[in-house]
Amino acid sequence: MKTNLVVLITFTILISLGFWQLSRLKEKKLFLASMQANLTSPAINLAEIQDSLPYHKVKITGQFLPNKDIYLYGRRSMSSGKDGYYLVTPFKTIEDKVILVARGWFSNRNKIIITQATNDRQHEIIGVTMPSEKTRSYLPANDIKNNVWLTLDLKEASQTLELNLEDFYIIAEGKDISNLDILLPLSINHLAAIRNDHLEYALTWFGLAISLIVIYVIYRRNVISV
């Protein structure tokens, strides 16, 4: 009797997890469809967006704030470069919002020259809004002293730069306004490759549930035969 109850509870849990993954599959499909629609649409003024949801193509007007650059290490998904940094600079819009903008990638050997990239002229930036990154336990902490960041945590950036940053950042499209050849443009193509694996997860849970029943049936037959 106890075995029957354990099997029933386990089977119910496995089936529930399978249906939960099917629900997540539907949600992810809607999310990806909405994201792709936003990314392929013309850029809209940031002020027209009613919330700070990520993956909107926007345009902002304002100026970069000097002496506030962040050097974000790595991320080959945004650039083909191997050993270098993403130049991330706070941008103050004409609406008086301050937003971090990922402007381009530069190699490690050009770290000194890149300080010439920021000026206080007004510009229009077109790019894609991105959510704040979460600190991962397997990554070292950001090296604030040497300005080497591994995670673009916007709360930490706000504290470090002493700025009231928006809760999203922007990946700028195209060549940076500095026209420095050493600052390579970024790409958002990696966003189109976001996977939706929830069907595989659902099939895994359902498969485990079926396996459980098969094992239970074999077990019961052996018990009866004995």
UniProtKB/Swiss-Prot annotation:
GO cellular component terms attached to this protein's record: plasma membrane
Topology term for the membrane: Multi-pass membrane protein
Chief localisation class: membrane
CDD domains xrefs: SURF1 (cd06662)
Listed transmembrane segments: 3-23, 199-219
Pfam families the UniProt entry points to: SURF1 (PF02104)
PROSITE patterns: SURF1 (PS50895)
Localization in the cell: Cell membrane
Superkingdom to which the source organism belongs: Bacteria
The entry's keywords: Cell membrane, Membrane, Transmembrane, Transmembrane helix
InterPro entries: Surf1/Shy1, Surf1/Surf4
Family listed: Belongs to the SURF1 family.
Name of the molecule in the record: SURF1-like protein
Lineage of producing organism: Bacteria, Pseudomonadati, Pseudomonadota, Alphaproteobacteria, Rickettsiales
